[in-house]
Amino acid sequence: MYKCALVLAAGQGKRIKSDLPKVLHKVCGKEMLKHVIDSIRKSGIDDIDVIIGKGAELVKERTLDRNVSYSMQAEQLGTGHAVKCAEEFLKDKKGVVAIFTGDTPLIKQSTIERLFNEHIEAKNSATILTAIVNDPTGYGRIVRTNDGVSKIVEHKDCTEEELKINEMNSGIYCFDIELLVDALNKITNNNGQGEYYLTDAIGILKSQGKKIGAVVTEYEETIGVNSRVQLAEAEEILKNRINLMHMENGVTLIDPRTTYIGIDVEIGKDTIIYPNNILEGNTKIGNNCLIYQNSRIVDSNIGNEVDVQASVILNSNIGDNTTVGPFAYIRPETTIGKHARIGDFVEIKKSTIGDGTKVSHLTYIGDAEVGSECNFGCGTVVVNYDGKNKHKTIIGDHSFIGCNTNLVSPVTIHDNTYIAAGSTITSEVKEGDLAVARAKQRNISGWVDKKGLKK
């Protein structure tokens, strides 16, 4: 059977008080709308239409990589009106459509699959995703009879008996497409808000004798984010889910409460993550790594048996058995080889560092290609910027760079070379050479006495 999905993402989001469209606020590093789209896609639904309104162009721009179509809701006149704006998408389609809201980032793939399966197997005309809550105040109640769902009653319209019902409407549904399109044409805005409610379609189908079903899920999956407080609540719930998944997969989190792991991060088994770490984007961390406290790793590939201590790594690759930090800054487009050592207060930008190379402390390397088994003394600076352009430095294998050295780019240091401490290198150093580029030491005898400085 053909299955498709609509995602309502046109709302103003006034309570979140932001210039950014509400559905583009992030939860665990990913926009809420993308969370919803990705869960739908993982459930096997490829045909997805997003109803957009506020910030439409930005919403399109941020979701271009999700291969969805768009329908425009120029005026926000209710959920029924939003779905009606997707009539062109639904035109001539037969099968089942699920309707979601773009501000429910916690919905699970398995729940979506269950919703579709129940709808199809029970031969329902409409199926509502519901949840049981201790305090359903403000939510629409699900009224059931022996033959399924009888109606959805808004909180303000509930009788005393209906107020006791703790099964609430999540705002997520499945419909037979043709029946939905017909019901949408019969919905009116004859209510206190002057809006077209999608819930009225349920009542219309029920009045026609159609079968309405419901699938119950956990309340947290149905949470809609309408404020910064709810955004933080969703963040906490998803963070806990992610951390639990990694621990179940063989990763040790010393303190899950203070460990932030983005939803797309991958971590190998027997890796230990210490407190106060932030792992974001498409980061991949290998097996048997130690990520000590206060590190931030974004969109980077970390090999096996790597130690990272209190460092920032951005869009870079770190080879197996390498140590980084403490207090290292690995900037984008950097690749560090295996068995390397990047020490304290080292900054590396857009450079390649070979296997076994040691850059132990207080060094800047930018726009450089560094070979294997090199050693950088304390205070080395690759001078890559002339005030207008960046230039490249090449350093061969087995080179030794003495302390307090400046390498003025563009410059090439060949294999097996030594650079004397305190040198400023501005020209090529041939293989096997020692380069000394500093003023000759001169001692002035008796100078302290002559100046009257002796203590």
UniProtKB/Swiss-Prot annotation:
Mg(2+) binds at residues 103, 226. GO terms for molecular function: glucosamine-1-phosphate N-acetyltransferase activity; magnesium ion binding; UDP-N-acetylglucosamine diphosphorylase activity. UDP-N-acetyl-alpha-D-glucosamine binds at residues 8-11, 22, 73, 78-79, 140, 154, 169, 226, 331, 349, 364, 375. One of its GO terms (biological process) is cell morphogenesis. It catalyses: alpha-D-glucosamine 1-phosphate + acetyl-CoA = N-acetyl-alpha-D-glucosamine 1-phosphate + CoA + H(+); N-acetyl-alpha-D-glucosamine 1-phosphate + UTP + H(+) = UDP-N-acetyl-alpha-D-glucosamine + diphosphate. The active site is at 361 (proton acceptor). Binds 1 Mg(2+) ion per subunit. GO terms for cellular component: cytoplasm; membrane. It is found in: Cytoplasm. Pathway: Nucleotide-sugar biosynthesis; UDP-N-acetyl-alpha-D-glucosamine biosynthesis; N-acetyl-alpha-D-glucosamine 1-phosphate from alpha-D-glucosamine 6-phosphate (route II): step 2/2; Nucleotide-sugar biosynthesis; UDP-N-acetyl-alpha-D-glucosamine biosynthesis; UDP-N-acetyl-alpha-D-glucosamine from N-acetyl-alpha-D-glucosamine 1-phosphate: step 1/1; Bacterial outer membrane biogenesis; LPS lipid A biosynthesis. The keyword Flavoprotein does not apply. Its cofactor is Mg(2+). Keywords: Acyltransferase, Cell shape, Cell wall biogenesis/degradation, Cytoplasm, Magnesium, Metal-binding, Multifunctional enzyme, Nucleotidyltransferase, Peptidoglycan synthesis, Repeat, Transferase. Residues 250-455 are annotated as: N-acetyltransferase. Acetyl-CoA binds at residues 384-385, 421, 438. Residues 229-249 are annotated as: Linker. Its EC number is 2.7.7.23, 2.3.1.157. InterPro entries: Bifunctional_GlmU, GlmU-like, GlmU_C_LbH, Hexapep, NTP_transferase_dom, Nucleotide-diphossugar_trans, Trimer_LpxA-like_sf. Residues 1-228 are annotated as: Pyrophosphorylase. Its main location: cytoplasm. NCBIfam families: glmU, PRK14354.1. Catalyzes the last two sequential reactions in the de novo biosynthetic pathway for UDP-N-acetylglucosamine (UDP-GlcNAc). The C-terminal domain catalyzes the transfer of acetyl group from acetyl coenzyme A to glucosamine-1-phosphate (GlcN-1-P) to produce N-acetylglucosamine-1-phosphate (GlcNAc-1-P), which is converted into UDP-GlcNAc by the transfer of uridine 5-monophosphate (from uridine 5-triphosphate), a reaction catalyzed by the N-terminal domain. In the N-terminal section; belongs to the N-acetylglucosamine-1-phosphate uridyltransferase family. Homotrimer. This is Bifunctional protein GlmU. The lineage of its organism: Bacteria, Bacillati, Bacillota, Clostridia, Eubacteriales. The gene is glmU.
